[in-house]
Amino acid sequence: MSNSIIKPHGGKLCSPMLNKKHLREVNNDILQLKSWTLTDRQLCDIELILNGGFSPLDGFMNQDDYNSVCEKNRLKNNLLWPIPITLDISNSFADKLDTNEKIVLRDKEGFAIALLTVSDLWHPEKDKEAHHIYETMDTNHPGVNFLLNDTHSTYIGG
């Protein structure tokens, strides 16, 4: 049996964790930035982004990748990807944000988990997403039910 590690999906391991030097540089800024408190599901997604489990993603999908995954099950660069990895936020929070703005993603206890630079904001067509990704609109399907009933109506890429 080989001890070699398989190559990450897409050929590149993305693990966008801050090193100690960068963490010290942004530490003071964190208190000044707008914050979003992550849901349990969002926290799982950001952990997989940060530890490389969602390589080659280095953040939440932008609208182009989201649309491509919903239509073709592939990222915009044509790499196979089965489901959108998105950050849904409330409209009221989205209204306060600008493209290229940095925000802090926090856990429920208020600890800063990640910094996100807003690449884009959009209102997804969740019915279309459910149909293309889950191939059903039946809310007995847990993915469809969660998407249609528990996600906010604005997605943010970054």
Please tell me what each predicted stretch does.
Residues M1-G158:
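Non-catalytic terminal extensions that flank enzyme cores
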